[in-house]
Amino acid sequence: MSLVGGFPHHPVVHHEGYPFAAAAAAAAAAAASRCSHEENPYFHGWLIGHPEMSPPDYSMALSYSPEYASGAAGLDHSHYGGVPPGAGPPGLGGPRPVKRRGTANRKERRRTQSINSAFAELRECIPNVPADTKLSKIKTLRLATSYIAYLMDLLAKDDQNGEAEAFKAEIKKTDVKEEKRKKELNEILKSTVSSNDKKTKGRTGWPQHVWALELKQ
């Protein structure tokens, strides 16, 4: 019985019919000398107490050894043109970060909702809007600026009899078409105010023909 392996074994007998047995045993002994007892104790015990092996058995044992398997894995990557794990550039080895589009979509929805709510509040401030009229954002802005100009004109006429001067905001002239539209609107407003001397109480109304002029734009 062997003291190292713990199993009974036969003494090593060299047969002349297997000329590769001596070379295989020498290669196995050289491999065992490179390995420590702590790393591979089973292989060391097997090397001391193993029976004589034939060349086919020895080739089969090498195919199942860890060193041979690791070497074969490396050869397999190089054979198929692949790159072993961790051998590529440092920035390309890990998984690609996934873009979080959900957060961007939620921010965009909140921004759109805030803009729509602001335009809805602005439409409520414009008087005499027909119920069947659907105003776009650009028409809402145009009507709002026209209504502001209308209110400023009323305030200027009311302050002519007072001591303090009315506050006037200067608006830059953009183009000829816009200037012409403002002149027509001012003429219509002047004719409307001159025909109606009574001052309206509460919310100031807006004539319907002004709406007709604005909606044609």
UniProtKB/Swiss-Prot annotation:
The keyword Transcription applies. It is found in: Nucleus. SMART domains: HLH. Residues 99-151 form the bHLH domain. It comes from the Eukaryota. Heart and aorta. Keywords: Angiogenesis, Developmental protein, Differentiation, DNA-binding, Nucleus, Transcription, Transcription regulation. Disulfide bonds: none annotated. Residues 83-94 have a biased composition (Gly residues). Residues 97-112 have a biased composition (Basic residues). Coiled coil: none annotated. Efficient DNA binding requires dimerization with another bHLH protein. Forms homodimers and heterodimers with TCF3 gene products E12 and E47, HAND1 and HEY1, HEY2 and HEYL (hairy-related transcription factors). This is Heart- and neural crest derivatives-expressed protein 2. The gene is Hand2.
